[in-house]
Regions:
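Active-site phosphate/pyrophosphate- and oxyanion-stabilizing loops and adjacent acidic/basic residues
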Residues: 17
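Phosphate/diphosphate-binding loops
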Residues: 113, 120-172
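Internal gly/pro-rich beta-alpha loop/helix module
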Residues: 3-4
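Accessory "access/gating" subregions that flank catalytic or transport cores
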Residues: 9-11, 20-21, 25-86, 91-125, ...
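Single conserved hydrophobic/aromatic residue that forms the stacking wall/gate
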Residues: 173-183
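Conformational gate/switch positions in structured elements
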Residues: 85-88, 138, 178
Length: 183
């Protein structure tokens, strides 16, 4: 962004955005939107409205402890592997899982790495920055491809819709997409 916001390379901060999106804790499509755009402003308003709609003031209460579970963490590891995300998350994700009472081991990362394709090469793993990744389909593409291949658990709960399948239906993903267009 070359200003306020996270860096344009795919480091820990942008990997966090990817994780929140693939775990269903962002609004659909929210990761990597430029911080000073009209779209970011619209997402901020929509996020506030969604937070209110799933709070105690509604009949659809979704506290984070009831939203994320083992499926969410497996999806997170697969997302991290498929996007070449920050290796810092090999420490952060097991700690987050432990805080939720879930055991996530490095061996789980190893096992999942054997079945998960690398779908994006964003700097420092390639020449494209995060803005180019987002413009080429970004998380919509990644989530759609991984769901189509049966690598993500689409029944995982999200803050939007009932599950990850509902979540992706809000995005502009159509399959099959040409993988050549994604950095």
């Amino acid at each position: 962004y070359h200003g306020e916001g996270t860096c344009t390379f795919y480091g820990t901060a942008n990997s966090n955005q990817m994780l929140m999106e693939i775990m269903g804790l962002h609004l659909p499509g929210a990761a990597f939107i430029h911080p000073h755009s009209d779209l970011r402003h619209a997402y901020n308003i929509a996020a506030t409205q969604q937070a209110i709609s799933i709070s105690r003031k509604s009949n659809d209460v979704r506290p984070i402890g009831k939203t994320i579970d083992e499926r969410s963490f497996v999806n997170a590891v697969i997302g991290l592997l498929a996007t070449g995300g920050s290796t810092n998350h090999t420490l952060h994700l097991p700690a987050m899982a432990a805080a939720a009472g879930i055991k996530l081991l490095w061996e789980d990362f190893e096992d999942l790495s054997e079945i998960t394709p690398l779908l994006a090469k964003v700097y420092p793993n390639g020449s494209a920055d995060i803005n180019q990744f987002h413009a080429a389909g970004g998380m919509s593409f990644i989530i759609g491809e991984l769901l189509d291949e049966g690598l993500l658990d689409g029944s995982a709960k999200t803050i939007w819709g009932e599950n990850l399948f509902d979540y992706i239906s809000c995005l502009l993903y159509t399959s099959p997409s040409p993988r050549d267009n994604l950095p």
